[in-house]
UniProtKB/Swiss-Prot annotation:
It comes from the Bacteria. One of its GO terms (biological process) is mismatch repair. GO terms for molecular function: ATP binding; ATP hydrolysis activity; ATP-dependent DNA damage sensor activity; mismatched DNA binding. The gene is mutL. It comes from Mesorhizobium japonicum (strain LMG 29417 / CECT 9101 / MAFF 303099). This is DNA mismatch repair protein MutL. Belongs to the DNA mismatch repair MutL/HexB family. Keywords: DNA damage, DNA repair. This protein is involved in the repair of mismatches in DNA. It is required for dam-dependent methyl-directed DNA mismatch repair. May act as a 'molecular matchmaker', a protein that promotes the formation of a stable complex between two or more DNA-binding proteins in an ATP-dependent manner without itself being part of a final effector complex.
Length: 627
């Protein structure tokens, strides 16, 4: 077949294959156009999941009648002049409308503020219809019918009406979060309606919009983020660890107001929460990155969902550092949903409540820590043994999965987990303790739960979960406060790599050495590994080095090695912490509470579960009809 020029319709259908994946893609493009036109109100109506009908109406600036024909022509736009590096609008390609029109029956009805009347133009499967007069208020209405009728093969890849409607709802919510001053409504053929009243662009207004989309519980269980580094500004909110989800669907990220699904941002969020959430739990986040358009490329993907940063290491470091600092500043906060669930469980006929922790719930972890390690503490054999245990000797932790040292061997001794300063003296009155965050210990029930009292609440603490977090933080601080002990390999491991990967590893050799990995160049395209961290024991050195090379190439960091070491420290903490079934003295319980108050992040255990639940006195009184 000879080379020939494709028809305009075929070109637009090819472009539609990149831009218009499903009905939600159409809604995204049309809503972005409305916002670029300065709309303060956007209404979306769908039928048949968006395959039969999509109608988007706005009160924006409108399109002058002479420009309607240009609006549906390929690569015609009012949003971009000459500089592709200075993009400040959501759309800029000039591809969406002609692409949509090539696979559907499209009509555009618009009127400007100065126009005496409206005008309308249509396209059917790529065939342009003439402009004609119409009646309409100021703004634009774009109507898409019979999506993919011109490319019926695409219909085979569509999901059911409910799934397509859900995807459309997610798109509207994702965009609406970034534009709190705009009113959004979405109505579907299944009578589902989404209404998001306008707020304002202030931080408080933005948080109200987030609550409209993500639920009223999120603001009460989130931490504000506000950080800047080298001209990149990060704001938003992240959930406290105990308010997590089983998937990452409620992680929203924006770059200069543009909703994105970026792997670098997702990886940074996961890395920031690595210490406080297991890999099968995900934080709830709303993050806004504001930076110079010249240092971010939004012209990477036709759908504009991906971006590329000029300095990805800077962006990742900012996100990880800001979130970790916010979690540390939050102290021992725990999710309010746990207390709400407990109150609901007390009501007659109430179903059992899951506070949003790990999917298998408390019992799976309880069984794990009862069975792990040394089978727990037997009060009969070890009556009232104090809590000042010592954990250390990482050099002796070289078993296959990172063995566990004996108490008191102090190569990496973290000291007593409950220090003398933290113990409750005779001169510390109960009244003083009642004024603390976790209050005064009153009892221990089922040999695992500490019941404490504050001036206006009742606090229930899971002693194993709490002590596990304290041990982990102590081990981690010891681990990163000095070089990690390493073990010399009998024979160096020679690893062949692409030259650029070998060079990157050599450039980071000093950092890797602090983590116990001795690595050096070994000729062209190869490195020699002479030492590995003792904690890793018998490990696949080749895979570790290749993973590190990939991470350095992607993010210019060596977090993989640090995360592996932290994971072993977490396992050691689980085995080294006080078990369920351990009887505690009153001073030990109070000492544990005081150390929780002094340890950032102690409101959540290493598995993402809350370490304590607080019941307000007012809520308890309501249960008994006193309020």
């Amino acid at each position: 077949m000879p080379i020939r020029q494709l028809s305009e319709t075929m070109i637009n259908q090819i472009a539609a294959g990149e831009v218009i994946e499903r009905p939600a893609s159409v809604v995204k493009e049309l809503v972005e156009n409305a916002l670029d036109a300065g709309a303060s109100r956007v209404e979306v109506v769908t039928a048949g999941g968006g395959l039969n009908l999509i109608r988007v109406t706005d009160d924006g600036s409108g399109i002058p009648e002479p420009e309607l024909a240009l609006a549906i022509a390929r690569h015609c736009t009012s949003k971009l002049a000459e500089d592709i590096n200075d993009i400040r609008s959501l759309g800029f390609r000039g591809e969406a409308l002609p692409s949509i029109g090539s696979v559907s029956r499209l009509s555009i009805r618009s009127r400007t503020a100065l126009g005496d009347s409206a005008a309308e133009i249509g396209i059917e499967g790529g065939r342009v219809l003439p402009v004609r007069p119409a009646a309409a208020n100021r703004g634009t209405t774009v109507e898409v019918r019979d999506l993919f009728f011109a490319t019926p093969a695409r219909l085979k890849f569509m999901k059911g009406e409910r799934a397509e409607s859900s995807a459309t709802s997610d798109v509207v919510k994702r965009i609406a979060i970034a534009f709190p001053a705009v009113r959004f409504t979405l109505a579907g053929s299944d009578r589902s309606t989404l209404e998001l009243p306008a707020t304002d662009d202030s931080p408080e207004g933005s948080l109200r919009r987030v609550a409209q989309v993500m639920g009223a519980e999120f603001p009460d269980n989130s931490i504000a983020i506000d950080a800047m580094r080298e001209g990149v500004h990060l704001t938003g909110h992240v959930s406290i660890p105990s308010f997590s989800r089983a998937n990452a669907l409620q992680q929203y990220a924006y770059v200069n107001g543009r909703p994105v699904r970026d792997k670098l941002i997702a990886g940074a969020i996961r890395g920031a929460f690595a210490d406080v959430l297991p890999r099968d739990r995900h934080a709830v986040t709303v993050l806004f990155l504001t930076l110079d358009p010249a240092i971010v490329d939004v012209n990477v993907h036709p759908a504009k969902a991906d971006v590329r940063f000029r300095d990805p290491g800077l962006v990742r470091g900012l996100i990880v550092g800001a979130i970790r600092q916010a979690l540390a500043d939050a102290g021992i906060r725990s999710a309010t949903t746990g207390a709400a669930g407990m109150m609901a469980a007390f009501r007659p006929g109430a179903a059992s409540y899951n506070h949003g922790g790990p999917a298998n719930g408390h019992r799976s972890y309880e069984a794990a820590y009862r069975a792990s390690g040394s089978a727990g503490f037997d009060p009969a054999r070890s009556p009232q043994r104090p809590l000042d245990m010592q954990f250390g000797d990482f050099e002796r932790a070289g078993a296959r999965h990172g063995g566990f040292s004996e108490p008191g061997q102090a190569a990496f001794d973290t000291g007593p987990l409950v220090s003398a300063d933290a113990r409750v003296g005779q001169n510390e009155t109960t009244e003083t303790l009642l004024g603390t965050v976790l209050g005064a210990a009153r009892a221990q029930v089922h040999e695992n739960y500490i019941v404490a009292q504050t001036r206006d609440s009742l606090v229930i603490v899971d002693q194993h979960a709490a002590h596990e977090r304290l041990v982990y933080e102590a081990l981690k601080n010891a681990l990163h406060s000095r070089p990690v002990p390493s073990q010399m390999l009998l024979l160096p491991e020679i690893i062949d790599l692409p030259e650029e990967d070998a060079e990157r590893l050599a450039m980071h050799s000093e950092t890797l050495a602090r983590f116990g990995l001795g690595i050096e160049r070994f000729g062209p395209g190869a490195v020699a590994v002479r030492e590995t961290p003792s904690m890793l024991g018998e490990t696949n050195v080749q895979q570790l080095v290749r993973d590190l090379a990939d991470e350095i190439a992607d993010n210019d960091t060596v977090e993989t090695l640090k995360e592996r070491l932290d994971k072993i420290a977490a396992t050691m903490a689980c085995h080294g912490s006080v078990r369920s079934g351990r009887l505690l003295k009153a001073e030990e319980m109070n000492a544990l509470l005081r150390q929780m108050e002094a340890t950032p992040g102690s409101g959540t255990c290493n598995h993402g579960r809350p370490t304590y639940i607080e019941l307000k006195l007012a809520d308890i009184e309501r249960l008994f009809g006193r309020r």
